[in-house]
């Protein structure tokens, strides 16, 4: 397993029967360094990569090394051999792991210190032999992109891969994805894949795998646990539940949002309860919400999107000419507004919206508040917008409404049919009943 090392570094390891995953000690001058030998992705062929006890990875030049000693062999060789056999034959796997990129599948370039989305999911599994205690897995690298570069055409490819995984006999699918646009992809898959045979679990990481505070391992273990044991057939997001490593939460894919830029527990269910929590140490899934979609016999694929849709975040002073240009001088077929409060914009745009809806453009209203639902019957401006043809979208998140509109536009041309689908609760994107416990509160006592 020294194939990641070349030239002199490879020869040294081969002569000492040292393989990746072994615990070794290196003496260099007065310094003794002990750690686990990792694969090297350095362009410098004279670098060993070691994981220290404190969790950090370091690169050590082979120059001036006085001694390299094997301490213990990798104890997971038998499990690794079994994992390779599983990977060679997808039919033997229970859970398919599909990698699309992001921090959870990242590596460090030791020349620059930069983190790049290039480490495959299989290589992560190599350093998480515990996964084999949960389920037999098979890994596929679909593509390796930063999540900000995600596009609707990639959603289609992911959906097709999920469908294929179920057709091959897998009972669950895990999708490794960057966290920034994970909620968009989760929504796209929820509308594209119906009658799911098992869970489709999106998972990511807020901290790269080289950092001691990384959430990669726990999130991936939790995701595989969810894919293995969950009773539902839904698209979900599985991420850290708190700032420690206690447990993970499983969120419905169309009711979740990344609510913090860097915290490990950044993802929260909005206007909904999490479906489950995962006690990752015990490999146990605890259901929190019984109103889930049950597994079906055969997954249906219907993945197509029309991206002639626009998400407008309303703000005071929005230039009317700018908005008019979007509605009249582009190929736009639909507009989702993230409005203020109960679903408002300035009344200055009412006639502009009226003309657009008469021209066949769908306009849907969501709220910037995120929590709560739109109610455009309370105030005068809301009623004026309703009269102009703006459609209230209940408690749908703005991003979910946008993805749903892209999916609907690809299936319907008639405005009334588009409206009918947009206000229909297709995959749990609308929660008809809100309770007090759905809104998070912060206590300063």
Swiss-Prot record:
Give the enzyme class: ligase
Keyword Protein biosynthesis recorded: yes
Residues at the catalytic site? 103, 179-180, 258
Which EC numbers does the record give?
6.3.5.-
Q: Which InterPro entries match?
A: AsnA_fam (IPR006033), Asp/glu_Ase-like_sf (IPR036152), Asparaginase/glutaminase-like (IPR006034), Asparaginase/glutaminase_AS2 (IPR027475), Asparaginase_C (IPR040919), GatD (IPR011878), GatD_N (IPR040918), GatD_N_sf (IPR037222)
Catalyses which reaction?
A: L-glutamyl-tRNA(Gln) + L-glutamine + ATP + H2O = L-glutaminyl-tRNA(Gln) + L-glutamate + ADP + phosphate + H(+)
A Pfam family in this protein?
Answer: Asparaginase
In what residue span(s) does the Asparaginase/glutaminase domain sit?
93-425
Q: Does the keyword Cell membrane apply?
A: no
| Keyword tags | ATP-binding, Ligase, Nucleotide-binding, Protein biosynthesis
Give the GO biological process terms. Answer: amino acid metabolic process; regulation of translational fidelity; translation
SUPFAM superfamilies in the record, alphabetically?
Answer: GatD N-terminal domain-like (SSF141300), Glutaminase/Asparaginase (SSF53774)
MF terms in GO: asparaginase activity; ATP binding; glutaminyl-tRNA synthase (glutamine-hydrolyzing) activity
Q: Where are the transmembrane segments?
A: none
> From which domain of life does this come?
Archaea
Family classification: Belongs to the asparaginase 1 family. GatD subfamily.
User: What is known about what this protein does?
Assistant: Allows the formation of correctly charged Gln-tRNA(Gln) through the transamidation of misacylated Glu-tRNA(Gln) in organisms which lack glutaminyl-tRNA synthetase. The reaction takes place in the presence of glutamine and ATP through an activated gamma-phospho-Glu-tRNA(Gln). The GatDE system is specific for glutamate and does not act on aspartate.
| Subunit structure of this chain's protein | Heterodimer of GatD and GatE.
The protein in question is named Glutamyl-tRNA(Gln) amidotransferase subunit D
Source organism per entry reads Saccharolobus islandicus (strain M.14.25 / Kamchatka #1) (Sulfolobus islandicus)
Taxonomic lineage per UniProt?
Archaea, Thermoproteota, Thermoprotei, Sulfolobales, Sulfolobaceae
Gene (name only)? gatD
């Amino acid at each position: 397993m020294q194939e990641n090392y070349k030239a002199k570094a490879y020869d040294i390891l081969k002569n000492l029967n040292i393989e990746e995953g072994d615990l070794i000690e290196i003496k260099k001058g007065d310094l003794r360094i002990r750690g686990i030998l990792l694969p090297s992705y350095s362009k410098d062929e004279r670098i060993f990569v070691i994981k220290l006890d404190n969790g950090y990875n370091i690169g050590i030049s082979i120059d001036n090394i006085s001694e390299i000693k094997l301490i213990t062999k990798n104890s997971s060789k038998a499990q690794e051999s079994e994992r390779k056999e599983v990977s060679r034959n997808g039919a033997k796997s229970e859970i398919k792991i599909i990698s699309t990129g992001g921090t959870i599948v990242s590596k460090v370039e030791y020349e620059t210190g930069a983190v790049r989305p290039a480490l495959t999911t299989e290589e992560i599994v190599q350093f998480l032999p515990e996964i084999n205690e949960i389920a037999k897995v098979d890994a596929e690298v679909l593509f390796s992109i930063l999540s900000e570069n995600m596009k609707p055409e990639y959603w289609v490819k992911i959906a097709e891969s999920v469908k294929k995984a179920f057709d091959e006999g897998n009972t669950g699918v895990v999708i490794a994805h960057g966290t920034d646009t994970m909620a968009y992809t989760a929504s796209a898959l929820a509308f594209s894949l119906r009658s799911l045979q098992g869970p489709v679990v999106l998972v990511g990481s807020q901290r790269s795998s080289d950092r001691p505070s990384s959430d990669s391992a726990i999130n991936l273990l939790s995701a595989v646990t969810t894919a293995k044991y969950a009773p539902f057939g839904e698209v979900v997001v599985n991420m850290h539940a708190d700032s420690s490593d206690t447990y993970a939460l499983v969120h419905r894919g169309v009711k979740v949002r990344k609510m913090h830029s860097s915290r490990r527990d950044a993802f929260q269910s909005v206007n909904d309860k999490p479906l489950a929590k995962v006690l990752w140490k015990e490999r146990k899934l605890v259901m929190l919400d019984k109103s889930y979609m049950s597994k079906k016999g055969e997954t249906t694929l219907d993945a197509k999107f029309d991206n002639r849709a626009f998400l407008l975040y309303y703000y005071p002073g929005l230039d009317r000419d700018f908005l008019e240009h979007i509605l009249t001088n582009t190929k736009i077929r639909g507009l989702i507004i993230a409005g203020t409060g109960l679903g408002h914009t300035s009344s200055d745009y009412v006639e502009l919206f009226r003309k657009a809806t008469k021209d066949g453009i769908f306009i849907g209203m969501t709220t910037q508040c995120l929590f709560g639902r739109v109610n455009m019957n309370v105030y005068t401006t809301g009623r004026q917008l309703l009269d102009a043809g703006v459609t209230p979208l209940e408690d749908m998140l703005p991003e979910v409404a946008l993805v749903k509109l892209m999916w609907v536009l690809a299936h319907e041309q008639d405005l009334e049919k588009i409206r009918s689908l947009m206000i229909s609760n297709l995959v749990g994107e609308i929660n008809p009943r809100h309770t007090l416990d759905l809104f998070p509160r912060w206590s300063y006592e």
